[in-house]
Design a protein with these regions (language model features):
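Glycine-rich cofactor phosphate-binding loops and adjacent beta1-alpha1 units
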Residues: 161-170, 194, 202-276
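Structural detector of well-ordered beta-strand residues that form the stable sheet scaffold
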Residues: 63, 83, 131, 171, ...
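Cytochrome P450 core scaffold surrounding the K-helix E-X-X-R motif
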Residues: 40-43
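NAD(P)H dinucleotide-binding glycine-rich loop of Rossmann-like/cofactor-binding domains
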Residues: 90-173
Length: 332
């Protein structure tokens, strides 16, 4: 099979011919139809997420069709369209798994990091972390739902319930793949969107307006109204104190990325009055089931830039440079 292989952090991915993997017990072999390019891929590629499996096939926003079932797999059929997200394995026995918080498992394995992912024509996945894809989406359109959508959805849940009797104002810092999905779900919940982008990023600001943002500005600006909550998708630690200054008393700031530059020190007064800063880690299977059922009801519409598998290096660089509106998706 064709694959784009990472041999060392920071070096261009290499086009390679690899054997088609065989599913072990409780695994599913999937013929990949599309794989989204996520900022987490860039963190792995750059070595910011250390100790990946090497050589490695990146990619964890995988959509494809079941080619074969390993032993002891139930509830799936050959030919069914399915998706594979970032969290690819949990031990099921640690304190967190037993407490229903498998996203914090002590011994997890992640797709496209410790398990070969979807920058290839085929992949295998643990059947527990394979999910049916809803109708109404092409393969490419569905791919960003598997991480940008799922992590965005979990981030939104962690901002808390929408206040009753007053407009709920949600700030989103960094308006890329995850933000464009979260904005649609938040508006479905009658939240008002305040979008923060890089200074001068007219393309991202116009994209936010198209998705219904009531205010758009640069990340170093204060919004005209105090926010009830903020989600930070940009991997920039200095945005944490900026967001704390923007939220009202008891406001919640959620850091929605897996990696962030160092957070600078800040005065206690901007955290005081019961403001909260929290991070998001991975996803649960319940998150996936809830969001994939909700997405077509909103309906969430993804904006994608399809690219051939051989253009994986170009896709990563365009993501790095902020040149994408929506999400790049590789087509094997």
């Amino acid at each position: 099979m064709k694959a784009m292989v990472m041999e060392r952090a920071g070096e261009p991915l290499r086009a390679a011919e690899l054997p088609v993997p065989k599913p072990r017990p409780r695994q599913i072999l999937i013929k990949v139809a599309a794989c989204g390019v996520c900022r987490t891929d860039l963190h792995v590629f750059d070595g910011e997420l250390q100790h990946p499996k090497l050589p490695l096939v990146l990619g964890h926003e995988i959509v494809g069709h079941i080619e074969a079932l390993g032993e002891d797999v139930e509830g799936f059929a050959v030919g069914e369209r399915v998706g594979v997200p970032w969290l690819g394995f949990t031990d099921g026995t640690c304190f967190y798994c037993r407490a229903g918080r498998e996203n914090l498992c002590d011994h997890p394995l992640f797709t496209g990091y410790q398990i070969d992912g979807g920058y290839a024509q085929y992949t295998v996945a643990d059947a527990r972390y394979v999910f049916p894809i809803p109708e109404g989406y092409s393969d490419a359109e569905a791919a960003p739902l598997l991480c940008a959508g799922l992590i965005g959805y979990r981030s939104l849940k962690m901002t808390g319930n929408v206040p009753v009797g007053a407009p709920s104002r949600l700030g989103i810092y960094g308006f890329g793949a995850a933000a464009h999905i979260v904005a649609q779900v938040a508006r479905h919940e009658a939240r008002q969107i305040y979008a923060f982008t890089r200074a001068g990023d007219a393309k991202a600001q116009e994209f936010a307006r198209e998705l219904g943002a009531v205010w758009v500005g640069s990340s170093d600006e204060m919004p005209p109204d105090p926010l009830d909550a903020a989600i930070i998708f940009a991997p920039v630690g200095s945005l944490v104190p900026a967001a704390l200054r923007a939220v009202r008393k008891a406001g919640v700031v959620v850091c929605g990325g897996i990696h962030m530059s160092d957070i600078p020190s800040f005065p206690y007064e901007i955290l005081w009055e019961e403001r909260v800063v929290r991070s998001v880690a991975n996803l649960t299977r319940d998150d996936a089931r809830e969001f994939l059922a909700l997405a077509p009801k909103v309906p969430v519409k993804t904006t994608v830039v399809p690219m051939p598998l051989a253009s994986a290096n170009e896709a990563l660089q365009r993501l790095r440079q902020g040149e994408l509106t929506g999400a790049a998706v590789l087509i094997p």
